[in-house]
Amino acid sequence: MSRALLFFVLAILALSAEARGPRVTDKVFFDMEIGGRPVGKIVIGLFGEVVPKTVKNFVELAQRAEGEGYVGSKFHRVIENFMIQGGDFTRGDGTGGRSIYGERFEDENFKLQHYGPGWLSMANAGEDTNGSQFFITTAKTSWLDGKHVVFGKILEGMDVVREIEATPKGAGDRPIEDVVIANAGHIPVENPFTVARAGVN
């Protein structure tokens, strides 16, 4: 095989891998409750090869005790046809939270986009202000591309995300009944696998 042909084949393979999407290297689960009622489990695939620092932050916070991470924290902001937001384990209202690296850490990169419903992204208050807060999209949110770091995708439990999305809200888009992460944890992935750059039904 000529050098030029080999280069062409390798380029096509690289483009094909890119089109297939990022590889899931870790999983995190959330056991969800609404108003004290169990509503199911959300399993999220995380992209540790693309955004390792962001993924490490999320995985560690999912394994910490209540009050120190995601266990016991709430989804405090829910907007239909947009997203559900949580991860503020210090104040519970969107003004708190912190990362494993300190209060805030920088935007790692914007290699991934908000391709549709079911993508996991870091909430922030502007450039390089990532802490522990995150959101899960319930629609395609292209206007957030390049502003929020995407680092995961829902693998199981999109029906639970939709149930949270549909829960009645009060002032400030806050659910009237508490939407709580009753339990959370890390699921190791022995063989990383790719996911499509598409929304979750």
Swiss-Prot record:
Signal peptide location: 1-16
- BP GO annotations: protein folding
Q: Which is one Gene Ontology cellular component term of this protein?
A: intracellular membrane-bounded organelle
- Residue ranges of the PPIase cyclophilin-type domain? 29-186
Q: What reaction does this catalyse?
A: [protein]-peptidylproline (omega=180) = [protein]-peptidylproline (omega=0)
Q: Which UniProt keywords apply?
A: Glycoprotein, Isomerase, Rotamase, Signal
EC primary class: isomerase
Q: Which residues are glycosylated?
A: N130
Instruction: State the SUPFAM superfamilies in the record.
Output: Cyclophilin-like (SSF50891)
Q: What is its EC number?
A: 5.2.1.8
Q: Name one GO molecular function term.
A: peptidyl-prolyl cis-trans isomerase activity
Assigned protein family:
Belongs to the cyclophilin-type PPIase family.
Task: Name the job this protein performs.
Answer: PPIases accelerate the folding of proteins. It catalyzes the cis-trans isomerization of proline imidic peptide bonds in oligopeptides.
> What is the name of the protein in this document?
Peptidyl-prolyl cis-trans isomerase 6
Q: Which organism is it from?
A: Caenorhabditis elegans
